[in-house]
């Protein structure tokens, strides 16, 4: 049992407590700035990925989250692209540099960036994109 997830009486979920405490400590303006920063960083990642035709934006950046997919030159079957994207996520996550996970959207395996840390910089985002590009070059399914 995670007592943090329960209210003072330890029987019901206290879902609002985390948000309430965050707003009390940081204030609504600071929370707004953090959310805006995440949105800007995700939009930067989207802009950078759109400049390379090997990447497909599956769902535009929203609230700091970007869903995209490596499509290479467009000739690989979806099953191979699904494996390739899974390998890319594993490669970059295993490196410890960034946490890039996969999900399924529109029946396809896609990569997901969730850029919500308030200290994430433009350089961090660009370096993550660079490492994604390196990972796709060495991913097993690409050989």
Tell where the protein language model's regions lie, with residue ranges.
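A generic structural motif
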Residues: 25-28, 72-74, 117-121
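C-terminal, well-structured subdomains that either form a transmembrane helix-short loop-helix hairpin
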Residues: 49, 62-67, 112-114, 125
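Flexible, glycine/charged-enriched surface loops at secondary-structure junctions
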Residues: 49-60, 102-103, 142-143
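PLP-dependent enzyme catalytic core of the Aspartate aminotransferase-like
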Residues: 105-143
